[in-house]
C-alpha cells in the first residue's frame, strides 16, 4: 500500500469495525520487514495486520524530506489509521518504535485499544554513547538474517538520516518518553527478550509501572528483537493479552 502517503504491508483479512486491527511499528532506521514473521503468525489466526515503513525510513524514505521527530511519526501513524479506517487498534512496537507508539497512545488515545512494547528504547538518563554500546552488545545475540535485514534497511534509509533520527530519539527519550507513558490509558504489555542488552529488566519493569494498566513479560532465549527471533512465543503472548488473560 502506498496511497496512504507512505509504504505499508497488510496481512490477513480487510479491517472490520468489530475486529481491531494490529499495527506493527518498527525501530529506528529500519523497515517493517523484520516484523513479517510475527505478522504472518497473527494473520494466520484471523488478525488484520498492518506493517508500515514509517516516513523517512526504508521504502518510505521519500515521504519525509528530513528525519521526522517522534511526535511527527506518531501523527503519521494516526493518519494511517484514518486513511485505512482501522479504528482503535492493537499497536505492537519494538525498540525506538515504542517511543512512537507511546506518543500515539498519548496524543491520539482513541486510536489505541491495547499496546505491546517490545524492548522499549531509548532509556532516559542513559547517554547516547552508552545506548550505542548496548546496541553493539546486542548484535551477537541476534539471528544473522536479522543483522542482514537491519544493515540493508540502514543503507536504504541512509547513515546520515539514521544518525539524525538517533539524536532526535535521544531528545525525546529525555524529555517526553516517560511523560507520554504516564498518559497511556490503554492496557499495556511490556515484553523483553531475556538476553536484551538494550532494554534492561529494570527499565522494562519501570515502563510497565508508568502506564495506567501495565504488565511485563520476558521471553527466554531472545534478545532485543524478540518478535523476530521468537515469533511463536511473541504471538502467543499477544493473543493471550488481547484475550484479556493475565499472568
Model-assigned labels for residue ranges:
Residues 11-59:
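Conserved HGGG/HGGXW glycine-rich cap/lid loop of the alpha/beta-hydrolase fold
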Residues 71-89:
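Conserved acidic catalytic loop of the alpha/beta-hydrolase fold
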Residues 222-232:
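Catalytic histidine-centered segment of alpha/beta-hydrolase-like enzymes
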Residues 184, 190-192:
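Short beta-strand/loop motif that positions the catalytic acidic residue
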Residues 150-177:
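Hydrophobic, aromatic-rich cap/lid helix
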Residues 99-107, 111-142:
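Flexible "cap/lid" loop of the alpha/beta hydrolase fold
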Residues 1-22, 44-47, 86-87, 156-157, ...:
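Alpha/beta-hydrolase fold catalytic core
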Residues 194-199:
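Acidic catalytic loop of the alpha/beta-hydrolase fold
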